[in-house]
């Protein structure tokens, strides 16, 4: 089973914004076709971000609560300890935890963050593929 690390913005795309591009990833997680690795630090970031006023408004419009989003996270993510610092450092310190975990577990990193995407070639040298959208293999 393929291991993945999922950036917070992708989680929001799945369960707050209902972005159609994130549906295949959501379906793969629900069917247990992927093993999503996440640390407590990643869950804490999601909890913090879900309190942002513009996201609270969006969740109200969609009839989704932050506790429901966190319940989805808890149901689908496999909790693992935070990883040691990877050899490459991201310009955005908030994204480093995702990079570190992906490198430590040789997992696919799903992120549309520009700073992470800029590191795509360097991370590939460490065995980590970075994709802005997960698409199942045909």
Please place each PLM-identified region on the residue numbering.
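Residues that scaffold the ATP/ADP-binding catalytic core of kinase and kinase-like folds
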Residues: 14-15, 49, 58, 119-120
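Short beta-strands and strand-loop turn motifs
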Residues: 6, 80-83, 112
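PIN-domain endoribonuclease scaffold, especially VapC-family toxins
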Residues: 27-85
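Alpha-helix capping/helix-boundary segments
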Residues: 10-11, 42, 115-116
